[in-house]
Amino acid sequence: YNNLEKDKKIITEYLISKGISANEIVFKAVQSRKDNKSMYVNGKYAGDEFLGYVLTQSLQIDSKNVETVEKISREITELLNKGIEFYSQPPRYYYTKLADLKVEMISKATADARARAEKIADNSGGQLGDLISAKMGIFQITGQNSNESYSWGGAFNTSSKEQTASITIQLDYLSE
């Protein structure tokens, strides 16, 4: 546990020196597992010898400073030179105003659907009547210019810095 606390201090100091504020560093709960050594007598398994516990702890950086986090993610192996066993993952990207974006996208998609329906009605010699039903599809976030496929349950890409958001709206109108 003392080693874990020492490493935590070194990691915190490192991240702060790289431009991350202390309140952006979130240490998760300490996880523990037993460390055993398999024992053999004359080539036959004779049980385990308990060696102690292995403690691990993960951390997360919650920051809006994307460039700083990306730079740190490329340089984080510097901690290995300080004797820290460290496993890192690539940054994940979240749009912080997603709720507002959804409302705006629903509004635009609805207006676009109506304009298309009016065009279809005009081109077929009819007129667009009253709206009889409206259905909203799944909100999708995919990597920009990626070949990610849309999903019935929705897609939520967090690995791409540049993302594309889409939604499908189905409007049913009476035809006159």
Show where each model-derived region lies.
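Short, charge-dense linear interaction motifs
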Residues: 1-176
